[in-house]
A protein has these predicted regions:
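Vicinal oxygen chelate
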Residues: 2, 22, 31-34, 60, ...
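A structural signal for short, well-ordered beta-strand segments
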Residues: 6-8, 88-90
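Core segments of cupin and vicinal oxygen chelate
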Residues: 8-66
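A generic structural signal for ordered alpha-helices
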Residues: 11, 39, 78-81, 85
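Short, solvent-exposed loop/turn segments at the edges of secondary structure
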Residues: 56, 85-87
Length: 128
């Protein structure tokens, strides 16, 4: 069954926020909190401070009725700045690639692709 999840972007306090949500919803993270230091360094990526390396790359927490909230730290040192409009994302988790392509094409018409649909983890894309 297709699902919708919510992605929240923070500027350095994702782990604190998600530990709070975890206590409110009395639930556990889907997987351990993933830190930037746990990911391979991408070619051309800026050198990060120890503080930035300890930032959250990804966290996922089930809340109500199967809804999952996910989050990340958006770091200015990596060229990201949290502003109204990029601090929340709605994710469509489709059952099939065909459904993902159909919805992505329809939603992206007239928008700006942040990340074209690709097969990074199943299939992924982002539209603004």
């Amino acid at each position: 069954m297709s699902k919708v999840s919510i992605y929240l972007n923070f500027q350095g306090n994702t782990e604190e926020a998600f530990n709070f949500y975890k206590s409110v919803f009395n639930t556990e993270f889907v997987t351990p909190v993933m830190k930037l230091k746990d990911a391979p360094l991408q070619p051309g990526a800026p050198q990060l401070s120890e503080k930035d390396l300890n930032s959250v790359m990804h966290v996922a927490l089930p809340i109500l009725g199967g809804t999952v909230i996910m989050g990340t730290d958006m770091l200015e040192s990596m060229g990201h700045k949290v502003v109204v409009g990029n601090n929340t994302t709605i994710n469509l988790e489709c059952d099939t690639r065909e459904e993902a392509h159909k919805l992505f094409s329809a939603i992206s018409a007239g928008g700006s692709d942040i990340a074209p649909l690709s097969s990074s983890s199943g299939v992924f894309g982002a539209v603004a």
